[in-house]
Curated annotation (Swiss-Prot):
Single GO BP term: chorismate biosynthetic process
Annotated FMN binding sites: R125, S126, S127, N238, A239, G278, K293, P294, T295, A296, S297, R319
Catalytic activities: 5-O-(1-carboxyvinyl)-3-phosphoshikimate = chorismate + phosphate
Keywords annotated in UniProt: Amino-acid biosynthesis, Aromatic amino acid biosynthesis, FAD, Flavoprotein, FMN, Lyase, NADP
Source organism of the structure: Acinetobacter baumannii (strain SDF)
GO molecular function list: chorismate synthase activity; FMN binding
Subunit structure as annotated in this protein's UniProt entry: Homotetramer.
A GO CC annotation given for this chain: cytosol
Gene name of the record: aroC
Protein family: Belongs to the chorismate synthase family.
Protein name in the entry: Chorismate synthase
Role noted for this protein: This reaction introduces a second double bond into the aromatic ring system.
Length: 363
């Protein structure tokens, strides 16, 4: 299973399963001298962890991260940083009924076909539980990028099911469990999720993630374009089925004279491209949006097959999110931070001595 790492110079490798002993990550490439504590990582982990809201899974995990290497006397040493989160609230018996059957819409069938068998407890390695380590690793990248460049990475939910947030107030985002910046949309989100629970079904969601003050020049054309790597990182998140950069799919109905992001000596006149031109950061705010599918873990019986390839029905038990997008914001922020950190190091490695013909224009 070779797909457990992301990044070239800032490289994150994770391991662990939903109902195993715990989750681990190795974060390689962190520059030495960064002041770093477990509390720095815990802030984002607390935003993602389960059991903190009635609108998400009721599995209660403290998600207390332990730094086991790579930090000495409060600073990074430049050696690999080892991270550990122990699982404490597994209820594997909830999954006994799917040991011989496949949950439709999940990775059960494909994991079994690929590896010959699977860890059926909570989805094993395919569970979104794994993303806790991404958030921890991403917090390191966020801290470094913020301190060195003033980069601010933040996200918010723009849509849950058919309910759409119409405005954005960043001050409202941390005040509700939906990471929503529209105070008027929150009651509608609450009512929808409550209704979904009662109906035994789920819904999808859409999120926007922004990275402000990213310097111009990051990205490695042609195959490792910055937007290509961002899309790769976002698509690696559980349940993500669509990624947009800038105006995204809306560009199909736009015209060239509307979307070309004209430049002046005082700055850009628009940002339809989402802060990336030719696969390289333009210095403008990077705008990313992701769409997450409805979780297939619902209490409505569904048709499936068993290990004998016989038709049967399955009823998913366990504790699940009625909308996985509710807790996806810190995960998406982390993945964007990991990609940006990697591209900063790659840009510095090759282009540290490059002198552009003029000072970059204002975003």
């Amino acid at each position: 299973m070779a797909g457990n790492s992301i990044g070239q110079l800032f490289r994150v490798t994770t391991c662990g399963e939903s109902h195993g002993v715990g989750l681990m990550a190795i974060v390689d490439g962190v520059p030495p001298g960064l002041a770093l504590t477990e509390e720095d990582l815990q802030k984002d982990l607390d935003r993602r962890k389960p059991g903190t809201s009635k609108f998400a899974t009721q599995r209660k995990e403290p998600d207390q991260v332990e730094i086991i290497s790579g930090v000495f006397e409060g600073k990074t040493t430049g050696t690999p940083i080892g991270l550990l989160i122990r699982n404490t609230d597994q209820k594997s018996k909830d999954y006994g009924n799917i040991a011989q059957t496949f949950r439709p819409g999940h990775a059960d069938y494909t994991y079994t076909q690929k590896y010959g068998f699977r860890d059926y407890r909570g989805g094993g390695r395919s569970s979104a539980r794994e993303t806790a380590m991404r958030v921890a690793a991403g917090a390191i990248a966020k801290k470094y990028l913020a301190e060195k460049f003033g980069i601010l990475i933040r996200g918010h939910v723009t849509q849950i099911g058919n309910e759409v947030a119409e405005k954005l107030d960043w001050n409202e985002v941390p005040n509700n469990p939906f990471f929503c910046g529209d105070v008027d949309a929150v009651p509608r989100f609450e009512a929808l999720v409550k209704s979904l629970r009662e109906q035994g079904t789920s819904c999808g969601a859409k999120l926007e993630i922004l990275a402000e003050k990213v310097p111009v020049g990051w990205g490695e054309p042609v195959f490792d374009r910055l937007d290509a790597d961002i899309a790769h990182a976002m698509m690696s998140i559980n349940a993500v089925k669509g990624v947009e950069i800038g105006d995204g799919f809306a560009v199909a109905g736009q015209f060239g004279h509307e979307t070309r992001d004209e430049l002046t000596s005082h700055g850009f006149l628009a940002n339809h491209a989402g802060g990336i031109l030719g696969g390289i950061s333009s210095g403008q705010t990077i705008r990313v949006a992701i769409a997450l599918k409805p979780t297939a873990s619902i209490t409505t019986p569904g048709k499936t097959i068993n290990l004998n390839r016989e038709d049967t029905d399955v009823l998913t038990k366990g504790r699940h999110d009625p909308c996985v997008g509710v807790r996806a914001t810190p995960i998406a922020e982390a993945m964007l931070a990991i990609v940006l950190m990697d591209h900063f190091l790659r840009h510095r490695a090759q282009n540290a001595d490059v002198v552009p013909p003029f000072v970059p224009i204002e975003p």
